[in-house]
Amino acid sequence: MIMAEKVRDLRSALERLKNMPGQLAETDVAVDPMAELAGVYRYVGAGGTVKRPTKEGPAMIFRNIKGHPDASVAIGVLASRKRVAALLDCEPENLGKMLYHSVEKPVAPVEFQGSPPCQEVVHLATDPDFDLNRLVPAPTNTPDDAGPYITLGMCYASHPDTGLHDVTIHRLCIQGKDELSIFFTPGARHIGAMADRAEELGQKLPISISIGVDAAIEIGSCFEPPTTPLGYDELSVAGALRKEPVELCHCVSVNEMAIANAEYVIEGEVIPGVRVQEDQNSHTGYAMPEFPGYTGPASDQCRLIKVKAVTHRRNPIMQTCIGP
């Protein structure tokens, strides 16, 4: 499969989809991120998550987000094998083999040289008007959700003892103007182990959350043990998939790195000794829709991230999905 422009970030990915008939829909109609955006996409896209036969619908860009005049929201970018294969320069029938072999030939990330795109605009938590709800157009998919969810945030952190890095995707809910909850599946995720060790040491764990990246990074971030054991940086898988290293930059407010070509980066620290109720604002008892088709229960064991900064590109594109 030969494509014109190489996919290196979300914007080049969307440009590629524009050139594929039926794979991307755009709208300038105003849409509310509170329970409306996801509902629209359910009907324009592939429908419900468990309906059979499985349908293929287009990805979608919402250009007019209520409350966020300078931002757009992209959804469903990875919602079909055909799209994922196209974004990775692969035939759909060879996608599984490509993912398998990517672990065998990792390409380590490198440091970005110059001014990173993700830091074109910087908001510090010390700014008087700082508010995650205003800065990040995270959708609330249903009225029962615990709050606005970041479903495609690439969480990047380092082990307190070894300094080894890891990237994973976790469910993140905006809890306040400078607070996020993060859910770690017990015993299953690398950054959860890092946060546990930092807590044992009585330390905060610096973390960056990069939103709006290319498909290789998102898919690489989903690799888990035993395929990629603790200490294996999954950005090396992404590098193998995209056939060039992922570029990282230094955060502006915490001692950690972030993905330089991301649309948004949220910087913060996982606070030791603190657990929060996921639905502490909505009191619905639910978290968010899960991919099998049900709404998952809210956790009372979420860790708390105290946000220190939000950086983003000019006219940023929030990337999301319905369900994790």
Map each language-model feature to its residues.
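Extended, highly charged
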Residues: I2-L304, K308-P324
